[in-house]
Amino acid sequence: MSKEYFGTDGIRGRVGEGPITPEFMLKLGWAAGRVFRQEGRRNRVLIGKDTRISGYIFESALESGLAAAGVDVAMLGPMPTPAIAYLTRTFRACAGIVISASHNPFNDNGVKFFSAEGTKLPDSTEEQIEHFIRQPMEIVPSSQLGKAARFEDAKGRYIEFCKSTVPFHMSFAGMRVVLDCAQGATYQVAPSVFKELGAKVETIGVTPDGLNINHEIGSTHPDQLAAKVVEAGADLGIAFDGDGDRVVMVDHKGEIVDGDEILYIIARDKMRKGRLKGGVVGTLMTNFGAELAFGELGIPFERANVGDRYVMEALLRNDWCLGGEGSGHIVCLDRTTTGDGIISSLQVLAALSDLGITLHEAKKGMSKLPQHMINVRVSQKVDIKGHTTIQSAVANAEKQFAGKGRVLLRSSGTEPVIRVMAEGEDEAKVRSIVAELAKIVEGSV
């Protein structure tokens, strides 16, 4: 059954436009409550959010809907998305809800759900929720209405959990770190974690006003952090996105260290310690340089479709524990159940501390290959794999790389374009091949 509202990462859109309205959120809360309240038991659902001004409206609406279905609600306030996943498990809640649009601007918002195990809901549960969204709303008898409360110690619990992912004997004393919290959900938690582990911390992006989340700051805009790291003479910088499930880093020279490089550093350290279970999962967009670097280490590598949901599916299918995306979604299943920017960055700092090296030195084992991409607009959906002219051109381009590069054509899931991308050792050659392929695609669709 196809879903009307749920996408690959929950429900998301522009505030005030369906389905991101108070009316829909009320119904969504009720529908979810009907699904979560099984066998008449009074289950509890956690609600967290990022710092968007609209989060307060939707928090109230979801709370009302859940209570109307007879479900108790615990509201945690602004908290990173992965914190909700963790706390859902430790509080023994039946589900967790996050109100966030991740790295998007303040005028977008959305909702994502976590199961009792702290993982994303299966399709079958999302389909059940959509079924009840289409039904008339019926409130349980007054004696069965859910109760709502705010939990004040949630931040402290999550801070202690983050710290527990670093060896007990390890301290980051003497390490100078700049944190960019993107005016988002990590603005209180992240500084506390790194300070309590001994690091000297400077911060930017820790004064959210409900409107400035992700605005020219955070993991999608690391330039401000890079400048601050160099200016402060810091050892490194760490940038999160608005809801804290992504991380990008900056070395002491101001050079960006993206998700592919972070994934490589963590994988190499786990392998060195004998703790890497199986191989590593990347995506179709993971830089070819990462694939080559993993190969040199003898680490199996597999590509999944773009999106942390697909990375997770590949990890579970292979029974592996580490995967991620260039955008900074890093999943360490031996530490947590979802992408976690704070915990991923802690694994990097622990590796640096253990080896006594800088972030700049740690990333040297992987050389990113030049990458170029052109978006070709199309008027209708195109079967790329079944198009003989396009596939012939792709095969010819791959021959030119002779195993030292790759070509990728894929349709966007959000806009009417075909993304034509190539990577290789020679940047001029890469650009030439992409330009030629883009022309062929334009002339064939």
From Swiss-Prot:
Entry keyword annotation includes Secreted: no
Cofactor(s) this protein requires: Mg(2+)
Residues at the catalytic site: 102 (phosphoserine intermediate)
Entry GO terms, CC: cytosol
Alphabetical list of Pfam families matching this protein: PGM_PMM_I, PGM_PMM_II, PGM_PMM_III, PGM_PMM_IV
Reaction equations catalysed: alpha-D-glucosamine 1-phosphate = D-glucosamine 6-phosphate
GO molecular function: magnesium ion binding; phosphoglucosamine mutase activity; phosphomannomutase activity
Annotated keywords: Isomerase, Magnesium, Metal-binding, Phosphoprotein
EC number: 5.4.2.10
UniProt-listed GO biological process terms: carbohydrate metabolic process; peptidoglycan biosynthetic process; UDP-N-acetylglucosamine biosynthetic process
Cofactor comment text: Binds 1 Mg(2+) ion per subunit.
Post-translational modification, as annotated: Activated by phosphorylation.
InterPro entries the UniProt entry points to: A-D-PHexomutase_a/b/a-I (IPR005844), A-D-PHexomutase_a/b/a-I/II/III (IPR016055), A-D-PHexomutase_a/b/a-II (IPR005845), A-D-PHexomutase_a/b/a-III (IPR005846), A-D-PHexomutase_C (IPR005843), A-D-PHexomutase_C_sf (IPR036900), A-D-PHexomutase_CS (IPR016066), Alpha-D-phosphohexomutase_SF (IPR005841)
Xref: Gene3D superfamilies: Alpha-D-Glucose-1,6-Bisphosphate, subunit A, domain 3 (3.40.120.10), Alpha-D-phosphohexomutase, C-terminal domain (3.30.310.50)
Residues involved in Mg(2+) binding: 102, 241, 243, 245
Phosphoprotein recorded as keyword: yes
Superkingdom: Bacteria
Modified residue annotations for Phosphoserine: 102
Family: Belongs to the phosphohexose mutase family.
Chain's role: Catalyzes the conversion of glucosamine-6-phosphate to glucosamine-1-phosphate.
PANTHER family, per the entry: PHOSPHOGLUCOMUTASE (ALPHA-D-GLUCOSE-1,6-BISPHOSPHATE-DEPENDENT) (PTHR42946:SF1), PHOSPHOHEXOSE MUTASE (PTHR42946)
HAMAP family associated with the record: GlmM_B (MF_01554_B)
NCBIfam families per the UniProt record, alphabetical: glmM (TIGR01455), PRK10887.1 (NF008139)
Protein name: Phosphoglucosamine mutase
